[in-house]
Design a protein with these regions (language model features):
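Conserved phosphate/anionic-ligand binding catalytic regions in large, soluble enzymes, centered on
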Residues: 11-14, 60-64, 224-226, 230, ...
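Glycine-rich phosphate-binding loops that contact phosphosugars or nucleotide phosphates
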Residues: 32-192, 217, 252, 260-304, ...
């Protein structure tokens, strides 16, 4: 990699904003606690919680849903554009968490208006304190990611995941909020470790070819979907995302020799070894992300499983940025997309 290419990789707003993620976590954690606790009190009184978002925000909603279900709280993650199909006529005990970076996209505002019409309780999680979602919900949790000049959401997504962790952990009542704050601050240093190894990703990015298949289980399935979206948004590449075991139920049939498979290996990925053996029969272009030196991209250890999605998504963001630059494209300004979908 020559100096020009190296500088190009790192001169994008997308990469600079990835670099700001440790600071984003610290600033957000120090800012949102009182509002998170207000949201917790509202959810504790509910019968069911809907978590609504679009694109990257929907992937954060999926992770929040899993956390709430593990805590014994009924929850459903719904895409903003689909929310009207899920709304029950009974408004008693309904809480809707609306997640949006901008707080101004048409679909999320339509979802809020439907909540207000039906009398649902509402919680907003945005990066924009003066947005329609922030000002129109009962409880507003504002992340402190700062302005995102790249169209691809990176640091705002990490901030959403931190808020999700704080909220779900507080609902669990397994510890004091101060303990959760300390764990969040600790994850910032782990992120810095991953970012500091970004030079390792340039050759990997260059070798990504064909269609990209992202595989992950549980919360890492949500981040597999996020990885697929990032490469579609920035690098114009065709992608898919599946749970590990599900990929063997049909989709593997169309895997080609020049396709790339990126596997997010979690703590309980039971299908991992079997899947690697099967995949290696059809493509040699396999990138693994996990905890241990045997993985293509090793992730630092983290004692809190609920924070794993943050660590796994960082290298994917970096790979997407690097691959896009390799292709001669601008990850900050995809030609058909806008930051706020009207």
């Amino acid at each position: 990699m020559d100096k020009y290419e190296s500088d190009s990789f790192r001169s994008t707003f997308m990469f600079r904003e990835i670099m700001e993620e440790p600071e984003t976590i610290t600033n957000t954690v120090n800012s949102v606690i009182s509002d998170v606790l207000r949201a917790v009190n509202l959810i504790k009184k509910s019968k069911i919680t809907y978590v609504v978002g679009s694109g990257t925000s929907y992937h954060a909603a999926m992770i929040m849903q899993i956390g709430m279900l593990k805590a014994g709280l009924p929850a459903i993650a719904v895409r903003s554009s689909e929310f009207s199909y899920f709304t029950p006529p009974d408004n008693v005990g309904i809480v809707v968490v609306l997640i949006s970076q901008s707080g101004e996209s048409k679909d999320i505002k339509d979802a809020l208006n439907l909540c207000l019409k039906n009398g649902y309780h509402t919680i907003g999680i945005t990066n924009s304190p003066k947005s329609s979602i922030s000002t129109g919900t009962e409880v507003s949790v504002v992340t402190v990611a700062g302005e995102e000049r790249s169209l691809a959401a990176t640091k705002s997504h990490v901030a959403q995941l931190i808020v999700s962790y704080l909220l779900v952990s507080s609902l669990n009542d397994h510890g004091k909020i101060e303990d959760y704050i300390e764990k969040c601050i600790g994850i910032a240093s782990r992120i810095k470790e991953i970012i500091d190894r970004n030079k390792d990703y340039s050759d990997l990015a260059r070798g990504i070819t064909g269609r990209i298949v992202f595989l992950g289980d549980g919360t890492l399935h949500a981040e597999a979907m996020e990885g697929a979206l990032k490469f579609e948004e920035t690098a114009n590449m065709i992608t898919e995302a599946y749970p590990l075991g599900e990929y063997l139920h049909g989709p593997i049939q169309v895997l080609r020799g020049d396709d790339t498979v990126i596997i997010l290996k979690g703590r309980d990925s039971r299908e991992y070894e079997r899947l690697i053996l099967r995949l290696s029969n059809f493509t040699k272009n396999i990138i693994t992300i996990g905890k241990g030196k045997e993985f293509t991209i090793p992730i630092p250890e983290c004692e809190i499983e609920d924070l794993d999605p943050i660590l796994y998504v960082i290298p994917i963001q970096i790979l997407a940025n690097f691959k896009t630059v390799c292709l001669g494209l601008d990850p900050d300004k995809p030609t058909r997309l806008t930051k706020v979908v009207k």
